Regions:
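Thiamine diphosphate
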Residues: 1-92, 97, 105-108, 114
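Short, intrinsically disordered, charge-balanced linker/junction segments flanking boundaries
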Residues: 113-119
Length: 119
């Protein structure tokens, strides 16, 4: 696993390790491996990255591993390079078996991410 790692303050009694990966597909594979090793794991991605993570989402959901994927849902890149909100990428993940929580503000994301880890 290649990436830059740093240590951060404690979250749920554990030190937080942050790893920045070079691609979303690699990040999803690292999330799967981290979950399989028993670590509390989350990742942050945008619409295009989520589509690259779908194969690993099937594996994570099939093994019932507790991951949290924070997704910034925006329109997929096109010739117009749209920056408007769109949920087509998230809807493409419905059949993976992952539970989805949808927030409408940054504050809700901050409030519900720990809740998602606890559930």
């Amino acid at each position: 696993m290649s990436g830059q790692q740093t240590e951060e303050p404690i979250f749920f009694g554990h030190e937080v390790q942050i790893t920045e990966m070079q691609s979303e597909a690699g990040a999803a594979g690292a999330v799967h491996g981290s979950l399989a090793a028993g670590a509390l794991t989350t990742t942050y991605t945008a619409s295009q990255g989520l589509l690259l993570m779908i194969p690993n989402l099937y594996k994570i959901a099939g093994e019932q591993l507790p991951a949290v994927f924070n997704v910034s849902a925006r329109a997929l890149a096109s010739h117009a390079l749209s920056i408007f909100g769109d949920h087509s990428d998230v809807m493409a993940c419905r059949q993976t078996g992952c539970a989805m929580l949808c927030e409408s503000s940054v504050q809700e994301v901050m409030d519900l991410t720990p809740v998602a880890h606890l559930s």
